[in-house]
C-alpha cells in the first residue's frame, strides 16, 4: 500500500512533524525529501527545515531588521534635522550680529538730509605774512589796528594796495570767531557792488586783507562834496546800492547794517557795500534771522528788528530807505534829536523821516514804501533797481538840485592818488585789486599775468577795506575800524576819552549796544568816526592793552543801542551832531544814544 502524503517511519502522515516532542524530551523537526519521506532536520535548525543540512534551515524573521532599520532611519532624520536647525540658527545669529553691527555703524554717520542748497564754491586765499607789507597805520581800537599796506603775491612782480585788519594779541576767542565769520561772508561774495576779501593771514593775531578804497565811505564823501553832487550821481548810487543788496539777497545774506557809512566809494561813478560784521547767511529753509543781542544801528533798523530782533531781506529794505534818505539829505543824521530808545514808539505812531528838499514825491514815495510796518508790503530790491534805474535815465525830473547841470565831482588819476597813498613805495608795479582778480575765472584761482599797471588807468580803482574810510590823499577822511569787534563791543576804551578829545576825537551816534555790559561805564566808549589820527597822534596815546580808533563808526556809536537789558533808564539826554568838527567839544555823558540799559519804550 502507498501513502497518500508523506511517510514517517512506518506511518503515513499528512505532514512531517515539526517541533514534535520525541525521545529524551527533544523536539523533533523533519522535512519531506524528494520521495516524500520525512527526514530529520539539522540539529541547529530550531525552527524546522526544508532540506538537509544547515542549508535547509529557514531564514530568520525580517521584522527586527525592519524595526531596527526604521529606528535607525528615524535617528538619522533627527540628527539631520538637528544639524539643519543648528545651521539655520547659527546663520540667523550671524545675520543678527551683522545687522546689529551695521546699525551701530550707521549710528556713527549723520543721516542724509539734503537741503537742495547750492554749494558755496568760493575760495579763501590764505596769505603768508611775508606776502604783504604794512605801510601806515590807518587807525586802532580795542580790537586791534588797521594798516594801509601792499600785498605782493608770492612769485609775482605786482603790488596791490590793501587794508590790513589785525586783531590785537589779547583778543578773545569770541572776537576771533567773529572776524572769521566776517571773513567767511566776505569770501562768499563776488559782485561789482560788494567789497571782497582778498585773503586772510592766520598768524598769532588774525589778519584780514581787504581792498583799499581811494575815496573813503560814502557818508563822508557826500558831506565833503555836497556842493558838487548832482542828481545823476545820487540816483546812480541808489541803483548800485540796490544792485549790491539784491545780490546779497540772492545769496541769502542779510546785511543788518546797511547805511551810508557802510558804502565805500571806489570812484564817483562806482560804490560798493561793505561792513559784514553783522551779516548773517540764511539756510535754505530759513526766512529770517533772530539775533540774540549786540550793538545795532537802531535808527536804520526796521521796527520788527528793534522790537523782536527779527532780521530779513525786507528789514534790509527798510535800512536801504534810510540810506537813500541820507544820500538825498547829503549826510544828515536820521531822526536827529530823537533818542534811540524812543525810535520804536515814534515809528509805531506812524512818524517817518521827512521828505528831503531835493526829492520829488516820486523818490520820496519809494522811501515811504521801504518804511512800511508790514515787511511784505515793502518793495523787493529787484523792484528798487528797476525804479531807480528808470529815474537815473532822467535825473532832473526826479531830483531838483540848484545848478545841477554845472555840478561835477573831482576825479584824480590813480597815479596821483597812489603816489600820495604810498609815498615811499615804487609805483611801477602797483596794480588795483580788481584789476588783479578780474583775469581769474575762479574767485581765487592761480595768479594770472595779464594785468594792466594801475598807473595807466585814468580813474581811481582802488578799494578801501570793509570797514575803513580814507580820503583821496589817504589821510583826510577817517577810516572805520572793525565793525563787530570794536564797534559792537561793550569793552570800554574810556581811559582814552580825555586825550581823544584833545586830539579832536568826537563820538559818533550810529550804534547802541545790545549786549549786557560788565559795568555801566562801558556805555561811554568814545568813537572818533570822522577825524584822522596821524602816526604822531597815535604815538602820544598811552600804550596799554586797549587801543582807541579814530576811524571807527561805532565803538560807542549811540545809534547802536543795547536791547539786551532790563528796564529802560529814564534819563533824558541831549547831544550835538557828531560831524561838528569845531570848538572845544566835550563828550556829554548824558547822551541818550549812549544808553547801555535799553529796551524800546513799548517793551518796557
From Swiss-Prot:
Q: What SMART domains does the database record attribute to this sequence? A: TyrKc (SM00219)
Q: Where is ATP bound in this sequence?
A: 138-146, 165
Protein keywords: ATP-binding, Kinase, Nucleotide-binding, Oncogene, Phosphoprotein, Transferase, Tyrosine-protein kinase
Please give the SUPFAM superfamilies that the UniProt record associates with this protein. Answer: Growth factor receptor domain, Protein kinase-like (PK-like)
Q: Which GO terms describe its cellular component?
A: plasma membrane; receptor complex
User: What PANTHER family does this protein map onto?
Assistant: EPIDERMAL GROWTH FACTOR RECEPTOR (PTHR24416:SF91), TYROSINE-PROTEIN KINASE RECEPTOR (PTHR24416)
Protein name listed in UniProt = Tyrosine-protein kinase transforming protein erbB
Can you name the source organism?
Avian erythroblastosis virus (strain ES4)
Amino acid at each position: 500500500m502507498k501513502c497518500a502524503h508523506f511517510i514517517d517511519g512506518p506511518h503515513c502522515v499528512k505532514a512531517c512533524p515539526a517541533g514534535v516532542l520525541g525521545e529524551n524530551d527533544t523536539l523533533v523537526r523533519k522535512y519531506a525529501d524528494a520521495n516524500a519521506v520525512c527526514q530529520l532536520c539539522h540539529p541547529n535548525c530550531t525552527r524546522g527545515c526544508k532540506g538537509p543540512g544547515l542549508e535547509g534551515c529557514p531564514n530568520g524573521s525580517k521584522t527586527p531588521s525592519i524595526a531596527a532599520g526604521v529606528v535607525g532611519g528615524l535617528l538619522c532624520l533627527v540628527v539631520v534635522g538637528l544639524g539643519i536647525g543648528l545651521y539655520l540658527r547659527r546663520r540667523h545669529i550671524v545675520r543678527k550680529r551683522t545687522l546689529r553691527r551695521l546699525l551701530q555703524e550707521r549710528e556713527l554717520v549723520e543721516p542724509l538730509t539734503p537741503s537742495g542748497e547750492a554749494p558755496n564754491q568760493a575760495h579763501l586765499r590764505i596769505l603768508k605774512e611775508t606776502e604783504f607789507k604794512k605801510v601806515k597805520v590807518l587807525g586802532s581800537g580795542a580790537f586791534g589796528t588797521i594798516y594801509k599796506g601792499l600785498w605782493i603775491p608770492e612769485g609775482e612782480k605786482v603790488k596791490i594796495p590793501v587794508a590790513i585788519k589785525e586783531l590785537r594779541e589779547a583778543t578773545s576767542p569770541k572776537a576771533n570767531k567773529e572776524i572769521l565769520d566776517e571773513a567767511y561772508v566776505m569770501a562768499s561774495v563776488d559782485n561789482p557792488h560788494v567789497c571782497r576779501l582778498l585773503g586772510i593771514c592766520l598768524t598769532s593775531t588774525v589778519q584780514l586783507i581787504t581792498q583799499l578804497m581811494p575815496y573813503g565811505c560814502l557818508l563822508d564823501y557826500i558831506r565833503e562834496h555836497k556842493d558838487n553832487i548832482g542828481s545823476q550821481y545820487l540816483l546812480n548810487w541808489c541803483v548800485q546800492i540796490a544792485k549790491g543788496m539784491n545780490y546779497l539777497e540772492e545769496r541769502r545774506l542779510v546785511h543788518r547794517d546797511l547805511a551810508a557809512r557802510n558804502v565805500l566809494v571806489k570812484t564817483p561813478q562806482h560804490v560798493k557795500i561793505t561792513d559784514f560784521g553783522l551779516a548773517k547767511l540764511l539756510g535754505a529753509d530759513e526766512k529770517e534771522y533772530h539775533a540774540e543781542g549786540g550793538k545795532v544801528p537802531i535808527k536804520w533798523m526796521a521796527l520788527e528788528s528793534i522790537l523782536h530782533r527779527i532780521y530779513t531781506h525786507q528789514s534790509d529794505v527798510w535800512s536801504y530807505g534810510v540810506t537813500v534818505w541820507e544820500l538825498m539829505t547829503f549826510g544828515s543824521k536820521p531822526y536827529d534829536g530823537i533818542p534811540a530808545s524812543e525810535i520804536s514808539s515814534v515809528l509805531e505812531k506812524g512818524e517817518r523821516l521827512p521828505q528831503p528838499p531835493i526829492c520829488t514825491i516820486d523818490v520820496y514815495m519809494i522811501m515811504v514804501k521801504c518804511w512800511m510796518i508790514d515787511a511784505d508790503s515793502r518793495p523787493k530790491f529787484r523792484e528798487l533797481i528797476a525804479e531807480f534805474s528808470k529815474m537815473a535815465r532822467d535825473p532832473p525830473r526826479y531830483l531838483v538840485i540848484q545848478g545841477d547841470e554845472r555840478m561835477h565831482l573831482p576825479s584824480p588819476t590813480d597815479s596821483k592818488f597812489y603816489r600820495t597813498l604810498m609815498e615811499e613805495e615804487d609805483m611801477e608795479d602797483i596794480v588795483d585789486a580788481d584789476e588783479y582778480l578780474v583775469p581769474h575765472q575762479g574767485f581765487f584761482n592761480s595768479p594770472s599775468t595779464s594785468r594792466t599797471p594801475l598807473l595807466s588807468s585814468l580813474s581811481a580803482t582802488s578799494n578801501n577795506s570793509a570797514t575803513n574810510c580814507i580820503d583821496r590823499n589817504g589821510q583826510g577822511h577817517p577810516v572805520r575800524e572793525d565793525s563787530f569787534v570794536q564797534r559792537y563791543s561793550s569793552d570800554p576804551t574810556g581811559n582814552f576819552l580825555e586825550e581823544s578829545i584833545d586830539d579832536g576825537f568826537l563820538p559818533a551816534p550810529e550804534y547802541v549796544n545790545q549786549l549786557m555790559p560788565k559795568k555801566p561805564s562801558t556805555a561811554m566808549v568814545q568813537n572818533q568816526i570822522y577825524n584822522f589820527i596821524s602816526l604822531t597822534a597815535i604815538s602820544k596815546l598811552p600804550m596799554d592793552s586797549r587801543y582807541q580808533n579814530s576811524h571807527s563808526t561805532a565803538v560807542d556809536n549811540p545809534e547802536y543801542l543795547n536791547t539786551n537789558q532790563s528796564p529802560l533808564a529814564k534819563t533824558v539826554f541831549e547831544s550835538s551832531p557828531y560831524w561838528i568838527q569845531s570848538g572845544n567839544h566835550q563828550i556829554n555823558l548824558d547822551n541818550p544814544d549812549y544808553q547801555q540799559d535799553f529796551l524800546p519804550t513799548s517793551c518796557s
